[in-house]
């Protein structure tokens, strides 16, 4: 990727319950991480979200999770490597089928919530996720968190021939190791649109952020995430899009 891509977790409503402002966000993003039914989403929501992404020319990514609808996929759970691969294949395959029925396709994979965090904390789980992507389609990139040092993850991706897209967050606070501050702690999520915009621009320029302890943190990222369930992020997303386009000369 030659420029920083803007991605958003999206399609996270289900049944009569609505979350996020998908239609408002979609025109300004490059990549839509669409929930696949295990933490949020359902077949109808998936179909509608795919149609919205295709209408806006947005790349579609599968956003698989632990099977935890009640906990929104944010609770860590114990799975074997084989079970992790089963979860991924089931969810990616479901979204891919819905995409193909509308003339689209899944273009990358980004795990959600606790699956994402556990993947970053446990090398064996990261290996299982990369193996699952490679087995399903080795041409699909895997989106994962950019940290102070991406080299270990990159080596695993290279081992299985899977492209890695390293992701930074515009609306989350970081600790000094380059990990996201737990949502259980105060200040973990930025709720001011100007703060979100400034963090996005800092990352896009390749400049160091201020970690939660005040230390400088430099992240090497390919893509930037904003959350569609954070009203402040939605308020900032158009300004972020305009700033990224200006930086890229678009």
UniProtKB/Swiss-Prot annotation:
GO molecular function, one term: ATP binding
One Pfam family matching this protein: LamB_YcsF
Matching CDD domains: LamB_YcsF_like
GO terms (BP aspect): carbohydrate metabolic process
InterPro entries: Glyco_hydro/deAcase_b/a-brl (IPR011330), LamB/YcsF/PxpA-like (IPR005501)
Reactions catalysed according to its record: 5-oxo-L-proline + ATP + 2 H2O = L-glutamate + ADP + phosphate + H(+)
Top-level taxon: Bacteria
Keyword Transport: no
TM spans (from-to): none
Keywords tagged on the record: ATP-binding, Hydrolase, Nucleotide-binding
Function: Catalyzes the cleavage of 5-oxoproline to form L-glutamate coupled to the hydrolysis of ATP to ADP and inorganic phosphate.
HAMAP family (UniProt xref): PxpA
NCBIfam families for the chain: PRK05406.1-3 (NF003814), PRK05406.1-5 (NF003816)
Assembly and oligomerization: Forms a complex composed of PxpA, PxpB and PxpC.
Family of this protein: Belongs to the LamB/PxpA family.
Name this polypeptide is given: 5-oxoprolinase subunit A
